[in-house]
Amino acid sequence: MKVLIINFGSRRGGASQSAHRLFKSLLANNIESKMLIKNYDAGSLDPKLYIQQENWLINFYNNLLNAAENLLLKILGKPKNNFSYSIFGSFGIAKMINDYDPDIVNLHWVAGNMLSVNDIRKIKAPIVWTIHDHWPFSNGYHVPSYHLDGTNDSSDVKKTLWFKYKKWILSFKNDLTVVSPSKWIGNIAKSSEIFELNDHYHIPNLPKKNYLNFNHLADKNISKKVLKEKNIVNLPIDKKVISFGAMNPISDKNKGFDLLHKAWMKVDSKNFCLHLFGINNNDEAIYCKNIIPDAATSFVRSSICAETYGASDLVVVPSYQENLSNSIYEALSCGRPVVAFDIGGNNELIDHKINGYLAQPYDEEDLANGIKWVLNYANPKELEENARNKILKEFSHEHLLEDYLNLFASICKRSNNEDKQTI
């Protein structure tokens, strides 16, 4: 079996990390596999196929297409960080995929002008599309805009020419199977006009094995010492730490930093430390510090993420929408309780008042209540054990990988039988 995994990047963002973990797991199980990406993320030395070839003319052409789409989004007033048509795709990508001749093509996050819907139609191999947001079945939004700015884009989805075109083009791709990491997004995909006739499967993302190996019962000051020695951040040893992770907490409104800020104002912050980690934009880091002066900020490399969670007493994920949140996944794997809103797939990971707290959607008062409830819990080790056991018992890496392998194998078998009947 020959599998080609396709995703925009390989490291940055939840979809990239999930796709890359699956890719690495396939290789570890002797499954012939490649990962095709558009943007190279530093630090990855795995064998991959690249779209942006070492050809200045192709690179120039792809950059021109990206600029054209960005201009179109600007003219139409669409939010660049939450909307993508991917009209043009990348030059020659469908041919590149078909030349590799895979048995299965596993799509993940392929917007951002990586693959156009017409490129997807041209792929000859059966497709398994692991959906990480609404884009595959929406009119272009990744997160419905009514979650972010109060406007409702869902009412006119079926009226847009682009949606009708997208539905029409994808209808020609009969051998397309949908995989949903969360039951929540799976139910939405099943009821969508674009995917209502496709086969659907629920397979959560594979957890990180090294996080599960982290000693979650060790003294938190040990992790704080590691972060200090590596010049990441100096967290106080005499205060409990609440951690919030996001690469772009201000420009990516979906991360819910505005709601966290309001909730933090309702917490007796002099007794606790808020750690804002993962910020990769200096302007946004400065902005966050101006709003919450007593917060600690840091850019955390993926290699030190386990220690970041390990130094925390709880992790808060105040997103407006989540599918199957990587942040929640990682925090629970490291044995840290999580406070988040009861939205999306969050309740598939967080059991209310067992391994964390599910606040009423977008209620900063209840978010603050959740933070205080965890920090004041009489037996924090109980919450930490429950957090880790949730992942160990219900999200086994081996079982989830087996689900993917069985799905891939069944699709290959069906495809081979259809080919024989055609002959």
Place the predicted regions along the sequence by residue.
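Membrane-proximal helix-turn-helix segments that form the acceptor-binding/catalytic region
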Residues: 135, 146-179, 184-198, 202
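Nucleotide-activated donor-binding/catalytic signature segment of Leloir-type glycosyltransferases, i.e.
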Residues: 278-303
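Short alpha-helical donor nucleotide-sugar binding micro-motif in glycosyltransferases
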Residues: 307-312, 404
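Aromatic "clamp/platform" in nucleotide-sugar-dependent glycosyltransferases that forms part
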Residues: 320
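Short hydrophobic beta-strand element within catalytic cores of glycosyltransferases
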Residues: 337-340
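Conserved acidic donor-binding segment of nucleotide-sugar-dependent glycosyltransferases
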Residues: 352-353, 357-364, 373-378
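A short, well-ordered alpha-helix in the C-terminal region of glycosyltransferases
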Residues: 379-394, 400-406
